[in-house]
């Protein structure tokens, strides 16, 4: 049995495409570090690795097999959600706001109640690290607003045409679904082949996400990363939701 590597500053991650799980007893765990070092997130995401851990743990770096992904044009927009989107678009008090107050979206995700889990993995360190990515143009947020009040949203990471969905939340019925519908429509319009959802949940499956083999995911990821010079314009409004109507 191989040991899971403990990474220091500037130490490279093992490549999940060419390396077996270091410890068969903890499938998908590829590395551990004391903290998130500068540049680590960029290196990790480009290898299909992401951090997921709690406050009382070291940083755990994962690349699960299978990998949950959403093909953007396979987003399941039910008849009831379509009705919600029509009302949302028609109501002048409602809006989609992109890339404003990124850390507020992260904090909302962290405090969101979820069945069977909590948001403790969105630690202060995680908020700081992803806010730094946002400031570099590598992370983005979508906020769902109702009369100026934040009622839902999500945040994601973007390298080239690779989109990694991180977390979402609702404070009002369908708040997170509206945000994901907007992100999915944006991806369809920009030729983004898939949204990484990382781990399987019943909620994501109900919205069209499905698991694929890690190898398939990583091969597709490399193709998307090769389009890193493509600059996406994250400047859209709720009118993007018309895609599903």
PLM feature spans:
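N-acyltransferase acceptor-side catalytic subdomain
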Residues: 1-245
